[in-house]
Amino acid sequence: MRELTEIRWHARAGQGAKTASQVLALALLRTGKSVQSFPEYGPERRGAPLRAYTRFGPRPIRRHDAIEHPDLVVVLDESLLDEPAVREGVADDTPVLVNRSGGRMANVEMLGAVAAALGEPPLDALQEAAVELLGGKSSPEALRDAVAEGYACRS
């Protein structure tokens, strides 16, 4: 069993990377994992690049630093691929998931892709966490469908 899995999210402010990280953390927490989810902001304006982090493992997490060498990188805005920060600390064999849909619920769809890439959390746990945290913004059915769509796109 892997001791600690670390995910670094890259997006622009307002695209939902922080929220996606929180949804993933909630789903993992409910499967018995220890989790951390936190954002790192630059200038606080809509559209500015930002990072969010998700860290999880089977034991309590004692570190509280930014993720420098991620096990998985998620990019919600493909225009950020040219940013050096996206490649920072990324090994040649590190998976990088890139949203190319540009859809309104891209962050939710990418949650499904992350779960498929990692093999956890279970799809239903992720769907329920999305409904719980985002149910006021979209219908439960739309959220479940978006997560499932991302999960089905694994390749």
Description of each model-found segment:
Residues 1-155:
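Active-site cofactor/cluster-binding pocket
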